[in-house]
Swiss-Prot record:
One of the record's GO cellular component terms: extracellular region
Known tissue expression: Expressed by the venom duct.
Entry's Gene Ontology molecular function annotations: toxin activity
Organism, as annotated: Terebra anilis
Record PTM: Contains 3 disulfide bonds.
Record note on domains: The cysteine framework is VI/VII (C-C-CC-C-C). Has the PXY motif between the first and the second Cys residues.
Propeptide part(s) removed at maturation, as residue ranges: 22-60
Cell location: Secreted
Keyword Secreted tagged: yes
Signal peptide annotation: 1-21
Highest taxon above the source species: Eukaryota
Taxonomic lineage of the native organism: Eukaryota, Metazoa, Spiralia, Lophotrochozoa, Mollusca
The protein's name: Teretoxin Tan6.14
Keywords assigned by UniProt, alphabetized: Cleavage on pair of basic residues, Disulfide bond, Secreted, Signal, Toxin
Length: 96
């Protein structure tokens, strides 16, 4: 029980520090956001977990943007929309 508590505290502290310095990159591309995160959290042992937590999220906690490191949720596909890779539903993906 104690190791689980330590792990949960470590993750919450790591995420708190990582979200604190995150600028608003609304217009930036996914590649530049990922590159900024890589530089900022390079030494973080929980980097891969933090990386997925820092992407823009939809209401169902699915990533809005996708890349080679960030995968879409089940039922969504990664598609180039206006030069940006975004997760779209399979129905939208097949329709266009």
């Amino acid at each position: 029980m104690r190791p689980l508590l330590v792990f949960v505290l470590m993750v919450s502290v790591s995420l708190a520090f990582s979200l604190e310095g995150m600028p608003n990159n609304g217009g930036d591309s996914v590649a530049s956001i990922t590159a900024n995160q890589a530089r900022r959290f390079k030494r973080n042992p929980l980097f891969s977990f933090a990386q997925h937590s820092l992407v823009d999220l939809k209401a169902r906690a699915c990533p809005y943007y996708c890349s080679s490191q960030i995968r879409c949720c089940l039922g969504f596909k990664c598609k180039d929309v206006d030069g940006t890779l975004k997760c779209v539903s399979k129905g939208d993906f097949l329709g266009k």
